[in-house]
């Protein structure tokens, strides 16, 4: 157990020293770790066209992210598909296949 601790400690020291060696000027490594105040304030985890959908208990959808259809239709048009027509065509094709 102690040997694992020493190995992790040695790895951390080596990783730190190689990171410091990458930046010969000490002040050069600092701007990478700091965020600018304007980008830090405007960050958001949600995409503009998403909303949280809460569902009822036991229906299998425990709350999820869903795109709002009008905004996605601007990018990719949603085709008009009638499910009842597709089911009827599938039944007709299945009946034709079983007769042959």
From Swiss-Prot:
Q: Signal peptide location in the record?
A: 1-22
Membrane spanning segments where?
A: none
**Where, subcellularly, is it found?**
Secreted; Host nucleus; Host cytoplasm
Coiled-coil residue windows: none
Q: Where does this chain carry the motif Calmodulin-binding motif? A: 78-82
Q: Name one GO cellular component term.
A: host cell nucleus
Query: In terms of one coarse class, where is the protein primarily found?
Result: secreted
Q: What positions does the record give for the motif labelled RxLR-dEER? A: 43-57
Entry keyword set: Host cytoplasm, Host nucleus, Secreted, Signal, Virulence
Question: What's this protein's family per the entry?
Answer: Belongs to the RxLR effector family.
Provide the function of this protein. Effector that suppresses flg22-induced post-translational MAP kinase activation both tomato and Arabidopsis. The perception of highly conserved pathogen- or microbe-associated molecular patterns (PAMPs/MAMPs), such as flg22, triggers converging signaling pathways recruiting MAP kinase cascades and inducing transcriptional re-programming, yielding a generic antimicrobial response. Associates with calmodulin to interfere with plant defense-associated calcium signaling in hosts.
The subunit structure is: Interacts with the host calmodulin.
| UniProt note: domains | The RxLR-dEER motif acts to carry the protein into the host cell cytoplasm through binding to cell surface phosphatidylinositol-3-phosphate.
Name of this protein: RxLR effector protein SFI8
The organism named in the record is Phytophthora infestans (strain T30-4)
């Amino acid at each position: 157990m102690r040997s694992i601790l020493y190995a992790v400690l040695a790895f951390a020291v080596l990783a730190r020293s190689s990171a410091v060696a990458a930046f010969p000027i000490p002040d050069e490594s600092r701007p990478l770790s700091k965020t600018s105040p304007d980008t830090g304030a405007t960050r958001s985890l949600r995409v503009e066209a998403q909303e949280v959908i809460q569902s009822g208990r036991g229906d299998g959808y425990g709350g999820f992210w869903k795109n709002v259809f009008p905004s996605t239709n601007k990018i990719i048009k949603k085709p008009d598909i009638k499910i009842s027509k597709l089911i009827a065509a599938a039944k007709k094709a299945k009946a034709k296949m079983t007769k042959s």
